């Protein structure tokens, strides 16, 4: 469209150069969209016992965490804590924390206070210039998916994805059980600009390591949680 507009600008007498300016803007927008929706192939590592990043981008942080609460069931609504940003929490974690049965409330673990129920969380921020197609961190089967909107708004609050607090933006949580029976949690999180999470799979889908399972449009982030007694984070620059 941008090229067509520029051709029109050359063939006709431009009005205050508005046609030329419009053509340049359209050309730039087309280039941005083509860059954003690119989906190049990736060389997926084949080493056993590792998890690969579910997203292209920059690692915001890697933190060891422990669950201190979970989303309440209907029977537990009378015994829950309310947070104005994050919503209602039952003040006990899941009986099997690392089963990731529902969304849990996590807190950082201090050095010296580690336990076998801890997990590592690695947060990957995707800028508008990064590839926004997300991939499975390991081969396995999706055993749970959960969509949550931001607290207090229809889909918001849409905090910038590079902020830690953005973990409570609109999000889709996917639990993958690997071939060895280990469960990991991948959470696609919308950002201030990216407001559309597009899952391409569902519960029961079997994925290969590195297989595409969804995307988030424009700027956003993906969090990966994995058992800390099995994995440890290693950041390797591309």
Residue ranges and their predicted role:
Residues 1-238:
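Contiguous, well-folded functional domains in the mature portion of proteins
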